[in-house]
Every structure is written in structure tokens, then in C-alpha cells.
Amino acid sequence: MKEGQSSRTAEAAAALRANHFKNTTNPVFSDPYAFEMTSKGWKKLLSTPLIVKLMNSPILNRTLGLLSGQVVGRSRYAEDLLNQAVQHNIEQYVLVGAGLDSFVLRKSQHYPTLKIFEVDHPDTQAAKQSKLKKLGELPSTVEFVSINFEKESISEALARSRYVRKTPTFFSWLGTTHYLKPDTTLQTLKSIAEFAANGSEVVLDYSTDFQELKGIERLGSMGVAQFTHLLKEPLLGQFKPSDLHQAVEKMGFEVVEDLSGEAITERYFYNRADNIRHTSATRLLHLRLNK
């Protein structure tokens, strides 16, 4: 992303959440603020009837729908697990690379004692906070923590906040690892493992090697790679599940669950009339710290 502006891919993800909420029956993930969170350009597209009809046509639901499924599926999964974690006395929630997620307006009222930390690039945060304040009152339980993932660790960033290290925490890290070098992703997970309390949980999505994909999945992944390259946010990070598992287990994490695209589709998109499903190009990983 360019200095002084918010992430273009975060804007695109918000647009996909907005379209899914506004233009599908029985949305997998409901984000009534997503439309206002995205850019003027995306708002114009989502307000053009012909574009909306095309975006939600059967042929695009089978292609673009893979990307929509990825975006809304990961958010639904993370918040389902967060809800379970809070019931088991998790008291802190860290959104790593929070993007334009609207949790603080959508759901924070349901978790009045949950301390929320949004960690992201300062330019994305500045644009986001401006939009959030126009849409509603921010709860006192949220704190915005700036970070440059390539230059500092998450522990260094959270050390500047009210984050309590001895308190078990739920970390949600969505839509970010794809744009980071694999070493940066692993260093961030290692940093979490070193400073987070035992019992803390992490949910993240990650890309697999698109060279191993076939048909529309492979073409779609190549198309997304070209699109993000044009946005100046190229895809950099891919992992083999077995290699990633081995790396995080050495850090002290237990792999609770690693869902393939097919498993996510089975859980959240089964038998949908609109044929939206989750891509096979990315997976969802649930970790628990057990040092």
C-alpha cells in the first residue's frame, strides 16, 4: 500500500462484505457497516444496478463468488470462535491487520467487558477511524495500535498499549498473511507465542501454492494475484499446511483445526441457492498456545 492512504485490498474486502450483506439471501456474515467503510469508487459500483446484477449473476457467483466466500467465510469463522473463547473467559481481543472490519460497531456491545485492540498500518487506521466516528460512537473498550509488520514485532506494538500480557487473548489475523513474506508471518506468530499468555488463541487465513490448484481455482488465484499487483499490494506469502503446522508447533502452539476450502464450504455454504462457496486457494487455521 502507498503511504498516506488506506489499504486498497481492505477496501475491496469491505466491498465484498457489503455486496454479500446487501444482495444475498441468508448472508453467511452480516456487516451492515461495510458499504460505508469502503471507498467512494466501490460505493459507486455497488450503487449501480447493472453492476450489482452482474456481480451477483450465476456465472460470477461461481467465479467472483469464490473470493466473496473467502472474505465472508473467514470473518464468520473468526467471530464464531471468538464467541466460544469469550464464554471460556477470554478477556482480550486483538485484531491483527484489522483492515476495515467493523466489529467495534457491530458487536462490541455484546461483549461489554472484552478489551479490543485493533493493530494495523497507521494510514489504514487513520482512514478507518474517521469513517467509524461518522457511523457511531466508539466504545471505551477499543484501542487502536499502529504497526508496520515488516519493521517491528506485534509485541513491540502492543507494549505501547493497555494490553495485559498475563491475560489469555484471542487473536484474529485475517486477510493479511497473503501480502507478507512467509518469514514475516512466522516471526509474527513467534512473537505472539513469546508474549501471549498460555491458553491464548489465534485464528488466521493463509494461502496455499496456487500452482497446485486446477481449473477455475487456479485461474482465479492467478487473476487475484494480478489484481492485487495492480493495487500495489502483491501476494507474497504461501504455505504448505504440513510445513506451517510444524513451524507453529515448535513455537508452542497446538493446531486445533486447519480447514480446507472444501471444509469451509461444507460448514458455511452448504447447498446455497446462489452457488457461492469458499475458494480452495486459502485455508483457515485455529491455534491455541500451550507452552
Each model region followed by its residue ranges:
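A short SAM/SAH-binding and catalytic strip from SAM-dependent methyltransferases
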Residues: Y163-T184
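Short amphipathic alpha-helix with an adjacent loop that forms part of the alpha/beta core around
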Residues: I154-R165
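Short alpha-helix
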Residues: L235-G261
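Conserved beta-strand signature within the Rossmann-like core of class I S-adenosyl-L-methionine
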Residues: L189, E194-Q211
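Short, glycine-/aromatic-enriched active-site segment of Class I SAM-dependent methyltransferases
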Residues: E217-P234
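A short, conserved alpha-helix within the catalytic core of class I
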Residues: V142-F144, S153-E156, Y179-A197
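Rossmann-like AdoMet
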Residues: M1-V94, L100-V145, S153
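Core SAM-dependent methyltransferase catalytic element
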Residues: R267-K291
